[in-house]
Amino acid sequence: MTSTIRQHAATRTGFSSVTRTGRTVLTVPARLCFIVEERYENDVMPGAVVDVLRSWGHEVDVLRPNGTVADLWDLLFTGSTRYDAFVLKTVSEGPGLTLLDAAGAAGITTVNDYRSIRLARDKAVAAVRARAAGIPFPKTWFASRTALLDQIPADMYPLVIKPNNGSSLKDVYRVDNPEELAQLDIDDSTRMLAQPYLVNPGYDMKLYNTGDEVFATIKRSPLHPGADVVEEQIPVTPELRALALAVGRAFALDIYGIDVVETPDGYVVLDVNDFPSFGMVPQAAERLARTVLRVTRRNAIAAATTTTVDSTLVPVLEATA
């Protein structure tokens, strides 16, 4: 195993549950690998989840893809540590996503499902997935180069412009006319999205699903930086809960967040995040740790009772009221 993974092999005390077919169901305690890129090393998430899992007696290693060459055969097939699941916290197109895809291709559980993460992270694909599922989502244009955005008709302004692979609300702009669009200083090689600006109260709502419950918060909007906004947790109405669960089903995500705005025509989803910060969510680390273990156990049992690989993307959301 690579040197950047914190190993605990010398103190392994777990055992494996084995079915009558001889296939391993799940090691107890669970053996997990978190893939965490440099940007998130000092963030609360996912470090707090790692700490909780370790405090419960599970064995958790942390792989930093920016600091090592990963021996894929050792990591996924022949190494002394056989992981029950991999958990990803990376930037949109970081190298960690390739490692998670590799784990999924090897038949190992990933949280979230590696195919679901791809659906959510490509914002153009996410927009289409949401629209196809009947989820309210803004009309979306995709441009392979920034310069192509000037082909959007002038009567569609104002527009919201953002990178197709953006994260953390960076480089999100409102432009009221083609002249303002031309003034944006954006690398022309950047793949961009454009969506009509939707009238809203001046703040965003963030819905979080920890896998067992939905939470709602009010967050500042990058389009209204001067607005007087109190960021706080708010009650989850039945409508908001239904919207959050619909997104989970459409993308087959277990843990996720969505950005929502309230418009004159109702709530509209703006973005889907496969592993957000879960800010202001009570006991977030404990809730997420339980979901990681539940998904790992569920998938291990399912794998032990089937003889074929099911490549169909299916909903895995288990949120309850």
Ranges and model annotations:
Residues V91-E93, N165-G166, F275:
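Short glycine-rich anion-binding loops that position phosphate/pyrophosphate groups of nucleotides
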Residues M1-L26:
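Short N-terminal or domain-adjacent regulatory/targeting segments
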Residues E38-K139:
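Conserved N-proximal alpha/beta basic substrate-recognition cap immediately N-terminal to
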Residues L159, L193, F215-A216, Y256, ...:
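Protein kinase-like catalytic core scaffold
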Residues H224-V269, N273, V281-T305, V309-A319:
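A long amphipathic alpha-helix within ATP-dependent nucleotide-binding catalytic cores
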Residues P138-Y157:
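Rossmann-like NAD(P)H-binding beta-loop-alpha module
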